[in-house]
Amino acid sequence: MNDVDIRHLQRCVELATEAVDAGDQPFGSILVSRDGTVLFEDRNRTGGGDATRHPEFAIARWSAEHLTPEERRHAVVYTSGEHCAMCAAAHGLVGLGRIVYATSTPQLSHWMQELGKPSLGITLLRIIDVVPDADVAGPVPDFAEEVRALHARAVS
């Protein structure tokens, strides 16, 4: 983990904040090319009723339409929270590269229990449970309290 990774993760947390401010769940993600160019960014948009409007899923779809397999393989996805199973599968299926996340699935699960939020009705899996050979880095402890506070805001 280096300063560039931290800067990109901070942008993801900013996008997650925008999501909460808009009534969506606190997740934000960006796609960065091999040369460091931010290619795509998005935030969660599930508040409108479509539970699949995750930023990581949007990145997978965008990259499949706009990047070559080699460009996808060398791109890095930065995200405020570790991918869910749906997004991890999409990531693996389109052949995206490294994933760097600020907070993990176990952290999210713990926070949801603490906040009294009911289960989503699905099993929360780690990225490596879905894409065993995925190149992942995270969580980053410095982001835990800020992201937990966003989840608390979203629940209230």
What are these regions (language model features)?
Residues M1-A19, G92-S156:
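Zinc-dependent deaminase
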Residues L39-T46:
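Short beta->alpha transition motifs characteristic of CBS
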Residues G48-A58, W62:
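A short, polar/charged loop-to-alpha-helix boundary motif
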Residues P69-G81:
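Immediate flanking context of iron-sulfur cluster ligation sites
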